[in-house]
Amino acid sequence: MSIRDLYHARASPFISLEFFPPKTELGTRNLMERMHRMTALDPLFITVTWGAGGTTAEKTLTLASLAQQTLNIPVCMHLTCTNTEKAIIDDALDRCYNAGIRNILALRGDPPIGEDWLDSQSNESPFKYAVDLVRYIKQSYGDKFCVGVAAYPEGHCEGEAEGHEQDPLKDLVYLKEKVEAGADFVITQLFYDVEKFLTFEMLFRERISQDLPLFPGLMPINSYLLFHRAAKLSHASIPPAILSRFPPEIQSDDNAVKSIGVDILIELIQEIYQRTSGRIKGFHFYTLNLEKAIAQIVSQSPVLSHIVNESSEEEGEDETSGEIGSIENVPIEDADGDIVLDDSNEETVANRKRRRHSSLDSAKLIFNRAIVTEKGLRYNNENGSMPSKKALISISKGHGTLGRDATWDEFPNGRFGDSRSPAYGEIDGYGPSIKVSKSKALELWGIPKTIGDLKDIFIKYLEGSTDAIPWSDLGLSAETALIQEELIQLNYRGYLTLASQPATNATLSSDKIFGWGPAKGRLYQKAFVEMFIHRQQWETTLKPKLDHYGRRKFSYYAGDSSGSFETNLDPHSSSVVTWGVFPNSPVKQTTIIEEESFKAWRDEAFSIWSEWAKLFPRNTPANILLRLVHKDYCLVSIVHHDFKETDELWEMLLDQA
């Protein structure tokens, strides 16, 4: 059924949800479990993102098709047209239709740069803007697809948009073109400034359409760092009144930040609904593949809580399957029959023995999380049925053992998180790219012609004289200052460092440099470094040195652009390098170095060398240099396991012997 028709048929307020295709197979399986739980929130539809230039095409199509066929919720697949061949567009639309998907969100996507721009011009692609894609779908497929488009309450920005002001009035002209071309609904970019959205909504109703479905895009605040990161990527302003609710003393406390963030989103929804007199009745959540904050928002929101209440009324308050306290009757088992989740008040010795354990080399730690095997998890009770909607919502909110297990990855952790998490990877979910415009890239990094020029770029980043490199625009963390000189020396020697951290032992969670998580905790870190190194330098110098020490002291992963991989660890191994111990809480892990995530990042990291090379014409010195690095260098990740010896990793790397 089309989103347009569903919208007009639904009288009461509702939500919709965006997901992105995870980078790993286990992440995808865990995401499907999560999406099944979140259907209890009765979303009108879900959307699945499409990577720039079709970089996630196969994963997007697979996830969207699986969701359409198994969730009983209409799926809307994103489709970007810029830098995407017409054949890919046609194939995607045909596969969507055959899978039962009838809703498409037509987007332009990131504009091509460098060689891609020249190629797109020479090929005379029919798709330069989203309006071209809308028009093409409507002309080629008629009413087979309900087509949505994006809107920008604060105005659209290209890259860093140097020297350009965001202008929503200017963007309204383009939005009107998309609607006139046949767009059936509109979803906005994320925002936190309600006044700017309400102004935009009035303009939209006055100048474009009185009744076209318009969905405000909302992103829950899961951590302070990623709150700012998401706002920066989306060019969304943050009102001072919201910023003031996150004083410095709580910014590293993810639980406190999330709690305040839930309150803020509830207030935004309430204000939008009231001040539009209910014209805005659907709220689109950018989930980041996470569930806890959204379930809490829906349950506590005066506008949306009827969703939860109606679920309880439909199922009957006396159904034991609907009570979270009785979920011991609904164990979750893996395909081998292992009980990995159990909410009984008294855990039996047998169950304790069957729980899975992990270790951090010298210290064995029990992790309270849902671990998915290669065969996946399933919910079972005596009747073989799923838990009730009320129970599923309670789980998504993080209540009980099942809830804690289901939301074990609830804080986005980027590419150094657990690759089993649906949220593993970049927070935008759109694939690898240089997240600045061409002009900004040239301003930041110039035109590198020699390896010495590349060293200078990495060193300037470490010195703070430039705030980004092609792989990261987040800037440096405070703890990097503790190993700044060592990292600079490594780069002088040709070890181009991408990521690193110093070691620490039992540091307070309130520490101004290392601090994170709830109060009164103790934090631990192993030193690690990730870097690009010439293959010959790796094979003749660094690898023999690491092999000499052995994997109990130093472990490593290494790979190159051809897909090669080597390690001194056992297959499918991992190392937790940052963890915290907090009162009345299981051990929390925030940084993990593991084989599967390394391989996924290896491919992305080398693709960024190629993207950087495309900024320069073929066969120019800069283009040749960057392509040679792509071809001749390795990516190496090294972990030092004795976190009490805080200097040993850096001494080993800088030792000339």
Swiss-Prot record:
Binding site residues for NAD(+): 18-23, 49-50
Residues found modified as Phosphoserine: 120, 301, 358
Known EC number: 1.5.1.20
InterPro entries hit by this protein: FAD-linked_oxidoreductase-like, Fadh2_euk, Mehydrof_redctse-like, MTHFR_C
Gene Ontology biological-process entries: methionine biosynthetic process; tetrahydrofolate interconversion
Region of interest (Disordered), residue spans: 308-329
This protein's UniProt keywords: FAD, Flavoprotein, NADP, Oxidoreductase, Phosphoprotein
Biased composition (Acidic residues): 311-321
Pathway: One-carbon metabolism; tetrahydrofolate interconversion
Keyword Phosphoprotein: yes
Binding site for substrate: 110, 189, 286
GO molecular function annotation: FAD binding; methylenetetrahydrofolate reductase (NAD(P)H) activity; methylenetetrahydrofolate reductase (NADH) activity; methylenetetrahydrofolate reductase (NADPH) activity
Cofactor(s) annotated in UniProt: FAD
Classification via Pfam families: MTHFR, MTHFR_C
Signal peptide boundaries: none
Positions with a binding annotation for FAD: 49-50, 78, 108-110, 129-130, 152, 171, 178
Catalytic activity from the UniProt record: (6S)-5-methyl-5,6,7,8-tetrahydrofolate + NADP(+) = (6R)-5,10-methylene-5,6,7,8-tetrahydrofolate + NADPH + H(+); (6S)-5-methyl-5,6,7,8-tetrahydrofolate + NAD(+) = (6R)-5,10-methylene-5,6,7,8-tetrahydrofolate + NADH + H(+)
Enzyme active site: 18
The protein's enzyme class: oxidoreductase
SUPFAM superfamilies: FAD-linked oxidoreductase
Protein family according to the UniProt entry: Belongs to the methylenetetrahydrofolate reductase family.
Name recorded for this polypeptide: Methylenetetrahydrofolate reductase 1
Biological source species: Saccharomyces cerevisiae (strain ATCC 204508 / S288c) (Baker's yeast)
